[in-house]
UniProtKB/Swiss-Prot annotation:
Keywords: Hydrolase, Magnesium. dGTPase preferentially hydrolyzes dGTP over the other canonical NTPs. It catalyses: dGTP + H2O = 2'-deoxyguanosine + triphosphate + H(+). Pfam families: HD (PF01966). Residues 71-262 form the HD domain. CDD domains: HDc. Gene3D superfamilies: Hypothetical protein af1432 (1.10.3210.10), putative deoxyguanosinetriphosphate triphosphohydrolase like domain (1.10.3410.10). HAMAP family: dGTPase_type1 (MF_00030). GO terms for biological process: dGTP catabolic process. Its cofactor is Mg(2+). Coiled coil: none annotated. It comes from the Bacteria. This is Probable deoxyguanosinetriphosphate triphosphohydrolase.
Length: 498
């Protein structure tokens, strides 16, 4: 075990808005750290962002069948898997935990991982990843002309303007989660808890690196926006993290998500009638054979079963079940699969402790070419080929695209107003034509207040006009991305007079 690694360096009780000041990475009072993390749990569990997940898409938008997963039920499953990984990690480490500074941290790490898992999807817009595409597509087509109308060519800072344009054209759910926690909900979580959400490490205005680049994995998506860059810089300072690195908690959260959703999406497809369990069993074995031998024993399985035998065993148990064959199939399959996958994730954390501690491991814990990796990839392959491209899913995604594009079209007049007029409206003063007044009144007060608060921060900035328009665009993205699927559909219908 690497003696130079000390996980306690990455844990601090410090918060952005603290009455007390702590030193670098803070504080070795473990009892107080656990107490502060309990406060984080309360803030997160009681937040509106978590409640909204119950009406946001996992795979099937606007789903009425409560047995099919929403983002909330998915996040609860990820939370449980994350907890299981942490407990398995400490069981596998045993007394060696002290060698890497993990002694006494089981409760703290468990809470950090659980809450990172629960929050990992809060930044996702309505209609899932297709919703992200719809927002970015609208801004790609409209933003340059809107920006030029407010900031004519030759005025302002050219480099800053280019960064702002690129930033706004790359909306991403992970980056939005950071913004939501820090600027919109103002949860004032410990820096350590928020760091667990930083799955990707580059600002949205920086280009995506080539796949061959050493830093590609951690930078393949935006991790935060220009508007939160100062916060992320301070987070890194407090936790002793170098730029371009991840917090160790993010690796466990990611592994828990990978393990949970790959099987859950398949189960939902059976619940929806897209596949039956016999079809699924055949597909799983065929797809697994592409990556690995289906007859090879799976490490960590108590019965030394192969993938083929696990699938057959689950099918046999389901056939004997007189009432709910589908449920029995997935219960058996999940129990047989989850244990070896969780053990593998925990062992990968241990085997790569130096890189995980430094935040430089350039892959997911489950992506190592191993047999457990083949299991996860098999489920993803089946979901990609048989679930995500199903006509029902694609039709709902197209409807979601039209809804989000339509909402942005409806509210675009607010981006065409002069800065003075929009600020007057945001402050509650009558300073524009009736149409934009009515639009502003439909915006949540929370998002208007976040805009006004951002404007206070640039009141004396010579580039205030650029920042004002940037924050106005952010506010519109906050508004649309914060909607549930149903709210977005209702708002679209209302403004379309349907």
């Amino acid at each position: 075990m690497p003696g130079a690694v000390d996980f306690k360096e990455r844990i601090s009780r410090q918060r952005p808005h603290d009455r007390e000041t702590y030193g670098h990475a803070g504080n070795t009072d473990l009892q107080d750290i656990v107490y502060q993390l309990e406060s984080d749990r309360g803030r997160i569990v009681n937040s509106a962002a978590v409640r909204r997940l119950q009406q946001k898409t996992q795979v099937f938008p606007l789903e009425r069948n409560a047995a099919v997963r929403s983002r909330l039920t998915h996040s609860l499953e990820v939370q449980q898997t994350g907890r299981f990984i942490v407990r398995t990690l400490f069981r596998q480490l045993g007394p060696r935990a002290a060698e890497v500074g993990l002694d006494g941290l089981e409760g703290a790490l468990e809470s950090l991982v659980e809450m990172a898992c629960l929050m990992h999807d809060v930044g996702n817009p309505p209609f899932g990843h297709f919703g992200e595409y719809a927002i970015n597509d609208w801004f790609e087509r409209n933003l340059d002309a809107l920006f030029e109308r407010r900031i004519p060519p030759g005025q302002g800072d050219g480099l800053l303007q280019q960064r702002m344009l690129t930033d706004l054209k790359h909306f991403e759910g992970n980056a939005q989660a950071i913004r939501l926690v820090v600027k919109l909900l103002r949860l004032n979580l410990t820096y350590t808890q928020t760091a667990g959400l930083l799955k990707y490490v580059r600002p949205a205005y920086e280009p995506k690196p080539d796949k061959a680049a050493a830093n590609h994995y951690l930078n393949k998506k935006p991790g935060f926006y220009l508007s939160e860059e100062a916060f992320v810089d301070e987070l890194r300072r407090v936790l002793g993290m170098r730029p371009g690195t991840r917090h160790p908690v993010a690796y466990i959260m990611e592994a828990a998500d990978d393990i949970s959703y790959c099987l859950a999406d398949i189960e939902d497809s059976v619940e929806k009638g897209i596949l039956d369990i016999r079809q699924l069993a055949d597909l799983l074995v065929k797809k697994f054979a592409v990556h690995h031998s289906p007859d090879a024993p799976i490490p960590g399985d108590a019965d030394n079963m192969s993938f083929q035998r696990m699938v057959d065993y689950s099918l046999e148990k389901a056939e004997r079940e007189p009432i709910n064959k589908v449920s029995e199939f997935f219960i058996r399959l999940r129990v047989k699969m989850i244990h070896p996958l969780v053990q593998h994730a925990a062992q990968q954390f241990i085997d790569n402790f130096e890189a995980v501690h430094a935040g430089t491991l350039g892959r997911a814990l489950m992506e190592d070419g191993s047999l457990p990796h083949a299991i996860v990839q098999t489920f993803k392959d089946v979901a990609m080929e048989w679930v995500f491209c199903h006509p029902e899913v694609e039709t709902l995604e197209l409807q979601g695209y039209r809804i989000i594009q339509g909402l942005l079209d409806f509210y675009a007049p607010l981006l065409r107003l002069p800065a003075e007029e929009f600020q007057a409206l945001a402050e509650g003063r009558q300073a524009a034509a009736p149409h934009p007044q009515l639009l502003v009144r439909r915006l949540p007060s929370q998002q208007i207040k976040a805009y006004l608060e951002a404007m206070k921060g640039v009141a004396e900035d010579p580039l205030q006009r650029q920042w004002e328009f940037y924050h106005r665009c952010r506010m519109l993205q906050d508004f649309v991305s914060g909607m549930t699927d149903q709210h977005a559909q209702d708002e679209y219908r209302a403004l379309s007079a349907l």
